[in-house]
Regions:
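Short beta-to-alpha transition helix within the HATPase_c
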Residues: 6-10, 22-39
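Conserved short strand/loop->alpha-helix "switch" segment adjacent to the catalytic nucleotide/phosphoryl-transfer site
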Residues: 18, 44-64
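A short, flexible helix-to-loop-to-beta junction within the catalytic ATP-binding CA
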Residues: 37, 73-81
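Short beta-strand/loop element within the Bergerat-fold HATPase_c
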Residues: 83-95
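Glycine-rich/acidic phosphate-handling loop/turn and adjacent ATP-lid/helix
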Residues: 95-125
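Short alpha-helical Gxxx[C/S/T] motif in the catalytic ATP-binding
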Residues: 126-130
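Glycine-rich ATP-binding loops of the HATPase_c
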Residues: 138-151
Length: 160
């Protein structure tokens, strides 16, 4: 993950930066992922209220946000450009980090345990990693397929 993080930082130094939050780690991850989404004509909306510093490990933040936003981008790409959207809501409250990622998708039922990626070695690792991060922070994660919308909600506890 360290190599990936340095690559992201390098890309952002050469490109446009948006300030989503004063938390440098989260802001760096979001800039990287949202620039990719915007290049793919995906409308992005955010509502983020997190402190400048918190004890969420940067590699955990990268795995959690990276996998969820990559999955949302991948689902949106299967739709015509005008129907592509994703939203991220993050709220820090009373030592909890509450996160919701929603995105448009085709109407096909999603099986989160089954990857559509061609690389079978990494199949299902993304959602498994998200579950592991939630468990590490004594939290929960839920995946909801609502037809043309997919939503992931995660709550992490003990975040200071």
């Amino acid at each position: 993950f360290h190599t990936e993080f340095r690559k992201i930082l390098g890309e952002l130094e050469n490109g446009e930066k948006t300030i989503y939050t004063s938390n440098v780690i989260i802001n760096t991850i979001l800039n990287s992922k949202f620039h990719v989404a915007e290049r793919k004509k995906i409308k992005v909306s955010t509502s983020i209220l997190v402190p400048k510093e918190m004890n969420l490990d940067y590699s955990d933040a990268g795995i959690l946000l990276g996998n969820l936003l990559d999955n949302a981008t991948e689902a949106c790409e299967k739709l015509p450009a005008g129907k592509r959207w994703m939203s991220l809501n993050m709220l820090y409250k009373e030592h909890m980090l509450i996160l919701k990622v929603s995105n448009s998708k085709d109407g096909k039922k999603v099986d989160i345990n089954k990857s559509r990626k061609r690389n079978l070695v990494s199949s299902g690792i993304g959602t498994h990693s998200v579950k592991c991060i939630a468990e590490k922070y004594n939290g929960t994660v839920s995946f909801m397929d609502m037809g043309e919308t997919f939503e992931v909600c995660a709550v992490l506890y003990g975040i200071f």
